Amino acid sequence: MSVLPSSVVASLDDILLRHRHQATELLQILIQAQQIEGWLPAATLTHIAAALGLPRARVEGVAGFYSFLYTQPVGRYRVLFSDNIIDRMLGYVELLDALCRKLWIEPGHVSEDGLVSVTTTSCTGLCDQGPAMLVNGRAIGQLSHRRINEIAELIRQQRALDLWPADYLQIDDHIRRR
């Protein structure tokens, strides 16, 4: 078992204190804890479990259930393609393959330089705007080969998401009242 650096322990204890060491706050605690190192190492899960008085298996189960929580190292750009039936019918598999080829990465892996990881999630909540993906938690819908080419270039340039074309991050509200 690895030992956590004292700065990480201090940050975790701060998060736990803000949530009053309440086990009912586990998901929020994990989300905030992940921001410390960009993922949730085993030692972090153990520390949280002990502090909340929960079995480690329960904490690990919650961390493993949500696709936006990472129990393995991920790239600085974390790309999650939606893998639901709608996105499959709209051709997401070809787009995922195209992005991976352009970034020289295999799906489910982290690039050698740690820049990017690409994988899938069961749903992004955007099947009305698919194919869709999340990049560092930001939704991008209506993917096309042109957009994938440009996204690959933006990632290679290490451009901050706030500087990406605004229309890429624009999600239309298709909910209508009668």
Residue ranges of predicted features:
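Feature of Fe-S/electron-transfer and energy-metabolism proteins
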Residues: 1-178
